[in-house]
């Protein structure tokens, strides 16, 4: 009986030693058999893929909560047949994606604001230039009007002076014309009184009186 026990014990010891030896030899071999990258590092696990249903449920949860508690993470993992680590990684990636989206929206809004400010500035500059051009045209028109009125007033003054010299004392000119006409008329009357015999005395007296007044 003792021999049997000793034999059994020795077999167990030998088996244990052989197992350890085999494990020590196999471990490096298994490490060598693992796929490695060109730089010698072991290849990482493939990216986790999520089904359409899982992605939809995770998006719904992320819409309400960007951060999950441990309890809620475990519940979602059981409901979607995922591990807790997968849920945690998905939410981390989703938060990073949200930050990038917000940053992109902010940059777009900033660019739109700058473009709008530039357009407003260009519009204001064009309005100012148009106003200045209009004011300069108006000022030039006023200057031309003033110069034209001055020239007109100067020419009119000279013309009025010359016209005044020609038309000075119209009563005197009329009297001179009347003297000339009546003088010749008086000569004719004085020389030909016999021809005026047919006229009445009153008319002759009026004519003679007018002639005498003119000569005087």
Swiss-Prot record:
Matches recorded under SUPFAM superfamilies: Homeodomain-like (SSF46689)
Subcellular location: Nucleus
CDD domains according to UniProt: homeodomain
Region (Disordered): 112-167
Chain residues forming the annotated DNA-binding region: 43-102
Source taxon at top rank: Eukaryota
A GO molecular-function descriptor: DNA-binding transcription factor activity, RNA polymerase II-specific
UniProt keyword annotations, A-Z: Developmental protein, DNA-binding, Homeobox, Nucleus
UniProt cross-references to InterPro entries, sorted A to Z: Abdominal-A (IPR022132), Antp_homeobox (IPR050296), HD (IPR001356), HD_metazoa (IPR020479), Homeobox_CS (IPR017970), Homeodomain-like_sf (IPR009057)
PROSITE patterns: HOMEOBOX_1 (PS00027), HOMEOBOX_2 (PS50071)
Extent of Low complexity compositional bias: 128-152
Family: Belongs to the Antp homeobox family.
Alphabetized PANTHER family for the sequence: HOMEOBOX PROTEIN ABDOMINAL-A, HOMEOBOX PROTEIN HOX
Role according to the record: Sequence-specific transcription factor which is part of a developmental regulatory system that provides cells with specific positional identities on the anterior-posterior axis.
Protein name: Homeobox protein abdominal-A homolog
Phylogenetic classification of the source organism: Eukaryota, Metazoa, Ecdysozoa, Arthropoda, Hexapoda
Originating gene: abd-A
């Amino acid at each position: 009986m003792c021999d049997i026990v000793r034999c059994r014990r020795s077999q167990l010891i030998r088996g244990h030693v052989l197992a350890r030896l085999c494990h020590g030899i196999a471990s490096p071999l298994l490490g060598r058999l693992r796929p490695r990258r060109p730089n010698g590092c072991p290849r990482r696990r493939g990216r986790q893929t999520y089904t359409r249903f899982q992605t939809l449920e995770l998006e719904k949860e992320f819409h309400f909560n960007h951060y999950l508690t441990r309890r809620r993470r475990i519940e979602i993992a059981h409901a979607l047949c995922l591990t807790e680590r997968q849920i945690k990684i998905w939410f981390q990636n989703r938060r990073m994606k949200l930050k990038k989206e917000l940053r992109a929206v902010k940059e777009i809004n900033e660019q739109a604001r700058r473009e709008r400010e530039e357009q407003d500035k260009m519009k204001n500059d064009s309005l100012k230039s148009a106003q200045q051009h209009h004011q300069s045209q108006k000022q030039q028109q006023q200057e031309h009007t003033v110069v034209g009125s001055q020239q007109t007033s100067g020419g009119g003054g000279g013309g009025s002076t010359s016209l005044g010299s020609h038309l000075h004392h119209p009563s005197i000119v009329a009297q001179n014309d009347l003297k000339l006409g009546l003088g010749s008329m008086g000569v004719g009357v004085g020389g030909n009184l016999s021809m005026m015999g047919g006229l009445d005395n009153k008319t002759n007296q009026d004519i003679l009186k007018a002639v005498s007044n003119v000569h005087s």
